[in-house]
């Protein structure tokens, strides 16, 4: 029998503990995988984002312990992963709008400035 600890704080100002974080994150990763389909299968961003998202979703589906999930993904607390996934959903739109895969000169990629404002 495993014991799951419930943390009281993330220790990050403004970022509250999410009691349903695993469920929320799995949903966001599934949304992201679906949304990535708007990009061409050959687009570099789509390929790398799909690989990372599938890996992370696999961790979440196969592990129930939040600490183990955080350690395996190794990209912050699960609440931070939720923020990252929400931002990734926005980035897909930016990549799609800019049509970054159609660059005339692949040695001079455009600079995409992302702001949460």
Curated annotation (Swiss-Prot):
Primary residence: mitochondrion
Any coiled-coil regions, as ranges: none
Its membrane topology: Peripheral membrane protein
Stretches that traverse the bilayer: none
Family matches, as Pfam families: ETC_C1_NDUFA5 (PF04716)
Keywords for this protein: Electron transport, Membrane, Mitochondrion, Mitochondrion inner membrane, Respiratory chain, Transport
A GO CC term assigned to this protein in UniProt: mitochondrial inner membrane
GO BP annotations, alphabetical order: respiratory electron transport chain
Tree of life domain: Eukaryota
Compartment list: Mitochondrion inner membrane
InterPro entries (alphabetical): NDUFA5 (IPR006806)
Function summary: Accessory subunit of the mitochondrial membrane respiratory chain NADH dehydrogenase (Complex I), that is believed not to be involved in catalysis. Complex I functions in the transfer of electrons from NADH to the respiratory chain. The immediate electron acceptor for the enzyme is believed to be ubiquinone.
Subunit structure: Complex I is composed of about 45 different subunits.
Recorded family membership: Belongs to the complex I NDUFA5 subunit family.
Entry protein name: Probable NADH dehydrogenase [ubiquinone] 1 alpha subcomplex subunit 5
